[in-house]
Every structure is written in C-alpha cells, then in structure tokens.
Amino acid sequence: MATFTDAEIDELFETSGTVIDNIITAQGKPAETVGRSAIPQGKTKVLSAAWEKHGSIQPPASQDNPDRQDRSDKQPSTPEQTTPHDSPPATSADQPPTQATDEAVDTQLRTGASNSLLLMLDKLSNKSSNAKKGAHGRAPKRGITNVRLNSRGVNPVAETVRKDRRTKSRPPLETRAQT
C-alpha cells in the first residue's frame, strides 16, 4: 500500500477541492422543456430570484486557505469566515428571507405540480367516462353507432339486415340443436 506525506495529502485535498468546485459550477446545456411549463405565469420573478440566491450560496471551504484555519483557532467562527472570498459577506438578516423564499417557492412548485396533475387526471377520467357513456349520456348500443337515418327515421342498413333475417329460412330445431 502506498504511503503519502502530509504535503502530498494536502496537495491532493487542494486539487480535489478545485476539481469538485469546477464540476459544481460547470455550465452545461440547459434542460429544455417540452409542452407547457410547470411554473405558473407571474411566478417567474420570485423563482428566478430564489434560484440566483441559491446558486450564489456555496459550501464553506475549510482547507482552501491555511491562514483561515489559524484565525479560526484563535477567534470564534463568524459568518464572514465561512463565506467564500468572491461573494459578499452574508449577514444573519439576509438568511431568513432566503430560507422563507426557498420554502415558499418549493411549496408553490409542489402545489402547482400536484394541482396540474390532479387537473389532468380529472380531465382524463371525464373523457374516459364520456367515451363509455356515449354522446347523450347513456351506454352505447352494440353494433354500429354512427348511422344515417332515412326519411322515416330508420337506419336503412339495419332495416335490410332485419328483412334478411326474416326471409331467411331456418333449419329445423333438430338440426340447430346438433350444431
């Protein structure tokens, strides 16, 4: 098994931290949606602001800067020490509205998604029940449903079939019982 010196281990941690940060902040192709958006109209500003705030918050990097570790041993931890250098220091007054906004956005997304899902399920069930009942709210008749009626209000095809059945000769009952 290979052994590493403390300097090599520190270098590996630093390199892996840099790689992880690059992966997290990498910009890929944005996801494309097909069909209607799940976000209700008028809510995009709130969601955009929440997303931008969420994207600007990064986890603390405790081993990036050795000076920072020395200071943390001497002084109690403050929000400024855990904040990355490239973003402005966060105050405790900024955090609760962000959390409340994030929770509100999550609730809106869940509620909106579940409401739209329920609405679509209702529409599908109504369509299927209407298809079963027929156009006039009653069960469909067996056979041809879209027929044209003649001037007497009778389906000419059905009338022809009835006439054929009446005029056809039937075999005797004994013969029918054998088949």
Curated annotation (Swiss-Prot):
Query: What InterPro entries does this protein map onto?
Result: Soyouz_module (IPR025909)
Domain of life of the organism encoding this protein: Viruses
Stretches the record annotates as Disordered: 45-179
Pfam families in the record = Soyouz_module
Biased region (Polar residues) positions are 75-101, 108-117
Biased segments, Basic and acidic residues type: 65-74
Stated family: Belongs to the paramyxoviruses W protein family.
Recorded protein name is Protein W
**What gene is behind this protein?**
W
